[in-house]
Amino acid sequence: MTNYGAIPTSSHASPLVDVESLSRAKHRIKAGLATRRAWRVMFDFHSMGLPHGVSDAFTRIKTNLAYFRMNYAIVVLIVIFFSLIWHPTSLIVFTVLVVVWIFLYFLRDEPIKLFRFQIDDRTVLIVLSVLTVVLLLLTNATFNIVGALVTGAVLVLIHSVVRKTEDLFLDEEAATTETSGLTSYPST
């Protein structure tokens, strides 16, 4: 007798991945990356120019930091990543720490519970920050990390001062209406 065309069944249950938690994680990653602005908007050369004064520079810094914060974070992380290429141990530690941050801080739906005690976000943030600094400093790449952070901060500061803010949509509703072409006009 053959079982041609029959679907074999297993007597033991295979471990199933929690599809719901993966879906939530995917949604949170997309929501986090949704705050990233288009790179062509960030580097639009027609929107570059020197500020008229110190107050204009501070206004641009404040506006651009708020508007391009995810892009700036990506730039700083890329600078840190490239600075650690010659330190493979530090690069591995950095990569592991990024994954830990993603799962313990950014993708978490529910508060962390440890021995029936609930740990708040501020504590998680402080512990992860201290752990990140200590582990990266223990990898003997302190000079590279500090240099990369300073380089990233200088790049962000230069861009935020030079990038004009007049064409930025600070109101999300206006931005989505403008990009979707659903502009309404008052009827006469």
From Swiss-Prot:
Coiled-coil stretches noted in the UniProt entry, renumbered to this chain: none
Gene Ontology process terms (BP): vesicle-mediated transport
GO cellular component, one term: endoplasmic reticulum
Tissue specificity remark: Expressed in lateral roots, lateral root caps and columella cells.
Places the protein is found: Endoplasmic reticulum membrane; Membrane; Cytoplasm
Transmembrane segments: 74-94, 95-115, 123-143, 145-165
Consequences of knocking out this gene: No visible phenotype.
Membrane topology: Multi-pass membrane protein
Keyword Transmembrane applies: yes
Keyword Cytoplasm recorded: yes
Keywords from the UniProt entry: Cytoplasm, Endoplasmic reticulum, Membrane, Transmembrane, Transmembrane helix, Transport
Domain of life: Eukaryota
A Pfam family annotated for this UniProt entry: PRA1
Family to which this protein belongs: Belongs to the PRA1 family.
Main function: May be involved in both secretory and endocytic intracellular trafficking in the endosomal/prevacuolar compartments.
UniProt-recorded name of the protein: PRA1 family protein F3
Underlying gene: PRA1F3
